[in-house]
């Protein structure tokens, strides 16, 4: 799957769950489960409830995603 096949959306972290998983509320009102990407994990970027994040989703499963960026 190429990079252009992913859907990028913005949302806010609603809740922190075990194993670096987060409940993210998207700007359109939907809530999804999202895990953090490898670069965020590698650089020890902390994500807390209330943070604005960019989420990458696949068109095949719209209930899960990957957090690729934390906005300042």
UniProtKB/Swiss-Prot annotation:
Gene: infA
InterPro entries: NA-bd_OB-fold (IPR012340), RNA-binding_domain_S1_IF1 (IPR006196), S1_domain (IPR003029), TIF_IF1 (IPR004368)
Top-rank taxon: Bacteria
Cystine bridges: none
GO cellular component, one term: cytosol
Alphabetized CDD domains for the sequence: S1_IF1
Domain named S1-like: residues: 1-72
Localisation: Cytoplasm
Record-stated family: Belongs to the IF-1 family.
Protein name: Translation initiation factor IF-1
UniProt entry tagged with the keyword tRNA-binding: no
Complexes and interactors: Component of the 30S ribosomal translation pre-initiation complex which assembles on the 30S ribosome in the order IF-2 and IF-3, IF-1 and N-formylmethionyl-tRNA(fMet); mRNA recruitment can occur at any time during PIC assembly.
Its job: One of the essential components for the initiation of protein synthesis. Stabilizes the binding of IF-2 and IF-3 on the 30S subunit to which N-formylmethionyl-tRNA(fMet) subsequently binds. Helps modulate mRNA selection, yielding the 30S pre-initiation complex (PIC). Upon addition of the 50S ribosomal subunit IF-1, IF-2 and IF-3 are released leaving the mature 70S translation initiation complex.
Main localization, broad class: cytoplasm
UniProt keyword annotations, A-Z: Cytoplasm, Initiation factor, Protein biosynthesis, RNA-binding, rRNA-binding
HAMAP family tied to this protein: IF_1
Entry coiled-coil feature ranges: none
